[in-house]
A protein has these predicted regions:
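Anaerobic metallocofactor- and corrinoid-dependent redox/one-carbon enzyme cores
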Residues: 1-155
Length: 155
C-alpha cells in the first residue's frame, strides 16, 4: 500500500484542510450525478487538489514513471519500480525499488526520502523542477461539504 501501515484518520475533499495530523484519504470524485469523464484521474489535477488542502510539497509515488511536475509547488517522485527508475532516472528523485532488489532496506530509503524533503523545503530543486516541469490543471468539480463522520473527533 502506498500509505504504509498508518491508521486512516479521516476523509477530506479538495480544499479541506485536515483538522489534525495523521493520514487522510482525499476524495477526488465529484459529488452529484454521474457525468461523462469522471472519474478522470489526472496526476496534475490531483497534485493541485492536494495543494488546495494545504500541501506545500508533494511526495508522488509511481511505478510506471509519471513525469509530473507542478507550476506551484515541488514534486518529489518516489519510484517503486527499479526498471522504471533506471529508464527515467533523470526525472525520478528516489529509487525505492532498491528495496525490492535487496540493495537497500526500508529504513535507508525512508531516511533518503526524509532528507530529500528537508533539502527541497530548504531550496534544493527536485528533478521535475530541474527539468522545468510546470504543468498545471484544475478540473471543474463540484463538492458538497464533508460530514463530521469523516473527520476525527477533536476535543
Amino acid at each position: 500500500a502506498k500509505s504504509g501501515a498508518s491508521q486512516i484518520v479521516g476523509l477530506i475533499k479538495p480544499g479541506d484542510k485536515p483538522p489534525t495530523g495523521g493520514l487522510y484519504l482525499l476524495d477526488v470524485i465529484p459529488d452529484g450525478e454521474v457525468r461523462h469523464g469522471f472519474p478522470n484521474i489526472n496526476d496534475n489535477a490531483e497534485i493541485a487538489e492536494l495543494m488546495a488542502c494545504g500541501a506545500h510539497l508533494n511526495l508522488f509515488s509511481t511505478g510506471r514513471g509519471s513525469v509530473v511536475g507542478s507550476a506551484i509547488s515541488p514534486v518529489i517522485k518516489v519510484c517503486g519500480n527499479p526498471e522504471t527508475f533506471r529508464n527515467l532516472s533523470d526525472d525520478m528523485d528516489v529509487d525505492a525499488g532498491r528495496i525490492l532488489e535487496g540493495r537497500a532496506d526500508l529504513d535507508e530509503v525512508g531516511r533518503e526520502v526524509r532528507d530529500l524533503v528537508l533539502a527541497v523545503a530548504n531550496g534544493q530543486k527536485s528533478k521535475s523542477e530541474m527539468l522545468g516541469h510546470r504543468e498545471f490543471i484544475l478540473g471543474y468539480k463540484s463538492f458538497e461539504p464533508i460530514g463530521p463522520a469523516c473527520l476525527p473527533n477533536v476535543a
